[in-house]
Amino acid sequence: MIPPSTTGPMNILDAATAIPKDMMAKLPTAINGPLAWSGADFEDEETYTWQLRGEDVEEIDAALQSFKSLGLDGDQVDSDNFPLPNLAARLSQSARVIHEQRGFFVLRGLGESKYSVEDSTTIYLGISSYIADKRGLQDRKGNVLSHITNSKLWKVPVEMRHGIHSTQALPYHNDMGCDILALQVRHGAEKGGYTYLSSVSTAFNELLAEAPSAAKALLTADWPVQISGRGAKCYLAPALAIHDGRLMASIDPNRFGPHPSSGPTNIPALTASQQSALERISKAAYRTELRLDLKTGDLLFFNNWALLHRRDSYTDGDDTSRHMVRLWLRNSKLGWAVPGSMLPPWFAAYGDNGVRTKLYPLIPMPDYKVPKYSAGSAAFVIEDSDASDDEQHFIARAP
């Protein structure tokens, strides 16, 4: 079904050795374009939701059966062996929406319970292969899928887990290093747990007008990004960068400065101006956010460089748990050039300089292991495992 294959390792310490301290250019007056939107710009969810028709689902089902008949491994799913002749053009256009227009879309209509977990995952990978040709690693052990859930089987106290493995609210952030963030909704929450998106450009424009010193602080490459709990290593990078005419964000409040779990460390704490700038852009993101009412079976794809995301706290049902499956994707043709100061986590996800196993866990493992570092983090960890130690890897063959 979803067996291992190979790709490059996460040699992030080598990737992080030569980063200039200050890459800030002159402040612009404003960032304009289709990515500079406000949640109020969207009258309803039909504006950004692609509702599949019956014939569309039939085409996807036929592609699934065609792929399974080939006897290939799940990791081999791509646009060549998952044929969608009628949907391909619109999926290609949706990839352009992510990179060149509003930056996101929701695909709806695959919520039927007729799919097994394996088939549902294969469909997710197959459709995603039309959006982007590369799937990134999400931890140092090579996991390509991560499960964002709070399993009822886990006994480890919630304060000792990653934030994505809890029911708590997560602040606005990016998944550092990811180009396109994709989420498959396996099951929604009983109450709450909404996903929110917010335009980095719109939030930044507010700072340019009202707090230019905060905008300058975010563009300055002196933010300490912790990359390991063992030895407490970090590199310096900007929270925002203007590169090739695009505003790009690499913000995770839980990775800036020393993490509480690290103990005594030489990693610098955030300065007062950095703390203020982080608070200001977060508040601006809240003011202009868009709430997504995602349904079971939905697929969400968005530009992780251009949009911040967060979620509400939530309550699960007695017998159900909110469950999303995450992919990190890159489109080799449309993907944005990444500034050198933001390369370390990107290189960790997409780099090719050695041999590494790629794993596709289908469900979370019942026995949750306490992470070595960054319990409570909203996004991934670069060196210590975010998913590999707490998810079971199902290695099987497609029937």
List each language-model region with its residue ranges.
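Active-site environment of non-heme Fe oxygenases that use a 2-His-1-carboxylate facial triad
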Residues: I2-S94, E100, F105, E112-K114, ...
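A short alpha->loop->secondary-structure connector
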Residues: Y124-K134
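Internal, non-catalytic "lid/hinge" segments that mediate substrate recognition, gating
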Residues: G136-D139
